[in-house]
Amino acid sequence: MRAPAIGALFFVIFVPLIIIMGDYWDHRPQKETAVLVGVITQNQTEEMAREYLEELAFLVDTAGAEQRAIFTQRLDVPHPKTFIGSGKLIEVREYVKEEEIDMVIFDDELTPSQLRNIERELNCRILDRTNLILDIFAGRAQTAHAKTQVELAQYQYLLPRLTRMWTHLERQRGGIGLRGPGETEIETDRRIIRDRIAKLKLQMTKIDKQMMVQRKNRGKMVRVALVGYTNAGKSTLMNLLSKSKVFAEDKLFATLDTTVRKVVVENLPFLLSDTVGFIRKLPTHLVESFKSTLDEVREADVLIHVVDISHPNYEEQIGVVETTLRELGGADIPCMLVFNKTDAYSYIKKDDDDLTPSTKENLSLDDHIEDWNRSHPGSLFISALKKSNIDELKDQLYQKVKEIHVKRYPYNDLLY
């Protein structure tokens, strides 16, 4: 082919492509921008506030937004009218206006009156932690069951907040905090919302009964449930033990629908459930709405509490899970404590001549293993991703399941 022909071909094929791609990059969807707000109080130390806001930032990322700034204020208690003081509110308002921020997210559940007052002052979309979690759940729900549960929780949250300054246009445009229960306008009659809640509760009653029948129909096989803080690696472990493909991702609430698989270890079968992860300040509406999902935990014979050992605040996360289990009525269920993500663990090693007191940041993985096996004998340390120490986990799990079979069922009634 002659050179002029090649040049002509370039202009015919590549120039239009370059123009198209340039137009795409100029008009590609932009992430919504968010400012985070938290308070330091008598009941929430500066360190706790920082940890909670880090988690809120992870939630924001999971929801698909971009965090631009964090504002904190030290108060005895949150301001009853605006959550934060007037001076801090002005500071946030100026930043929002100057940077053209889409939304401000508070790391606590705001009262309806606080929400209205803050919206009036900041003149932008206001979300709280509960609203954000509900929005993530709405985006994650796949089955009709999960969608019904989330929609019910959203409407229960929305009912006392119908006077929020959301316009019909905003709901049509969509965005974080605006997903879910349809094109509800500000002027929507409360009665319509209550009627919808009543219908959803009726649907959930039917779903709960169906789920209960399904659990009964599983026969006498032992039930094992994976529990833990969100993003601890439960789904990755589920995939490893069941040799199935359960959606696993480095995001909060990657699993929403409960997944149940039949697993066989050394010819002994049992049912393994992967459940929704727990989190600090889990909205009450979600706990109520996800009754049938959480029944998988309540009715389990054995719990595997999966902990992310690489998280700097894993001990507090353990406390959140244990508190939630108590509230669900599952505190007395035999539980295996499994520390996951050993491959991601890191620490700051002190020099031999460093005489300063050691902190938890200086503890090696071996130090943690020694401490936990002293206080909780039988604790396991694994990496589901790297498949390390999985055989020991299977051995312990086999012994637990076998013990329940032998104790509760005749030998000839075992399922093989």
Predicted segments with their positions:
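Conserved nucleotide-binding/hydrolysis micro-motifs of P-loop NTPases
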Residues: I40-Q44, L75-V77, E109-P112, N131-L134, ...
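Switch I (effector-binding) loop of TRAFAC-class P-loop GTPase G-domains
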Residues: G219, S242-L268, T284-S289
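N-terminal accessory targeting/assembly segments
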Residues: I13-R129, I133
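Positively charged N-terminal leader segments that act as targeting/secretion signals
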Residues: M1-F10
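C-terminal-of-GTPase-core extension/linker across diverse P-loop GTPases
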Residues: I20-L36, Q156, P160-A232, M238-N239, ...
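Inter-motif core of Ras-like GTPase G domains
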Residues: V287-H311
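Conserved catalytic network of the ASCE P-loop NTPase/AAA+ motor domain
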Residues: R28-P29, V96-E98, K262-E266, L271, ...
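Flexible beta-alpha connector loops of hexameric P-loop NTPases
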Residues: N43-E47, H79-T82, R140-A141, E185, ...
